């Protein structure tokens, strides 16, 4: 679904004149369950300072308009939630833009303790990043980090058990495929543990670790990363799609394991967080195993003075102190991912192992949360990408810069 500039302008005007609303809409009490309705709508615009690739193409090789830009609806999430009867909670979410199910699960809280529960259905796995486990509407930057998008395991159907308290927690899950048809497959399990030795208002220190192990889908996996712009079709960093070549992971790959480490520090209006992930792919028929990794470090400053909260091992974003003026944030992130595990064979057009490429990026961002339901984001992203070409027998580079804007309405 494409949005014209006129449509985006109308959406902005509607956001400016709409009255403030609550964070969720209470619907009814059905079967002793308090049912509420939530939603999230995001519209994105990208303008590319291209290097070698036209990222303005909706489909690679089909864009001939000469415009290095994209504008489109990013998310249109509709979510029903229920509390009760008793200690039961449930959720059913769907993204009408991406045509996929979101969280769709039932949770039972032991002793009505939010930190001690069992959950069945589709949910974000403990093998995801802390960034992924946080609410999407409060992400610090328009694009999530490369390890979140490329290495972590997000939503899958399964069961998990969580035990903890306000400042620590342990989670274990077993999962299968994603609920939506033709999405992620491969059964596995995930673990996450976290501890916050300091957990006070405006003063938080958090450490965490995660592990996941899963089967591949039909003995293949494809790891790739977009240039910090979620809607582009072309991905320069890519371990390949061939189902016959030994130099891609899309064949003869048996199991995948990912280890993650995370840290968070909040002091008043300042937040510093970072995450690291390393991935190992066990290969078949004598092929060498593959290893890759990545990390990000980000800092955020609430210019208007608000601070963050803490829940379930993730930071929570506050409402503006002054709804009419809103909450202003300034952020900076460094991000890197390395999908190279091999080397060229000198004098030939062949390689040992898999050379998917390496990407580094810097993102500078400004966010404005207005009242209770609106958010506007501006990002400037500088990307450096490098990958070995067997055709050229040399490394290729693609180093675009991207201006990104997002308008968001949520309730």
Whereabouts are the PLM-identified features?
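N-terminal low-complexity, intrinsically disordered patches enriched in charged
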Residues: 18-20, 48, 283
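Short hydrophobic/aromatic segments of transmembrane alpha-helices and their interfaces
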Residues: 5-6, 72, 151-152, 357-358, ...
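Domain-scale selection of a single, long terminal region
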Residues: 2-9, 186-193, 199-218, 252-271, ...
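Outer-membrane beta-barrel pore domains
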Residues: 26, 30, 52-53, 64-65, ...
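Gram-negative bacterial Sec-dependent N-terminal signal peptides
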Residues: 1-23
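Outer membrane beta-barrel
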Residues: 25-54, 60-217, 293, 301-322, ...
